[in-house]
Amino acid sequence: MFSYRPDVLRELERHGIRPNSGTRPELVRDYVRELYKYEIRRLRGRVVAREFPKSEYASRVDALRRQYLVLAVPARQFTVEDE
């Protein structure tokens, strides 16, 4: 069983992710990473379709990266030790 840190749960909730105590942190992190990769591909498609100038791409990628700060946390640190 896993006890997720409250701050990690808040960040996951921003992306609609609600792991239960039986969900492995590695699985959760992999899922978040796949969401991020999807968003990056979508953003790239938008710049190719000229929905916004190429000069804005880097700042939009940075803004997107900041929405996925939980990816900076190793999966093993998603949880707290049970007392």
Where are these regions (language model features)?
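Long, non-catalytic architectural segments outside compact domain cores
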Residues: M1-Y31, A75-E83
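Short arginine-rich
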Residues: Q67-A75
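A short, exposed loop/beta-hairpin motif centered on an aromatic-Gly-Thr core
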Residues: G45-E51
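Short amphipathic alpha-helical heptad-repeat segments
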Residues: V32-I40
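Short, charged, amphipathic alpha-helical segments
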Residues: K54-A63
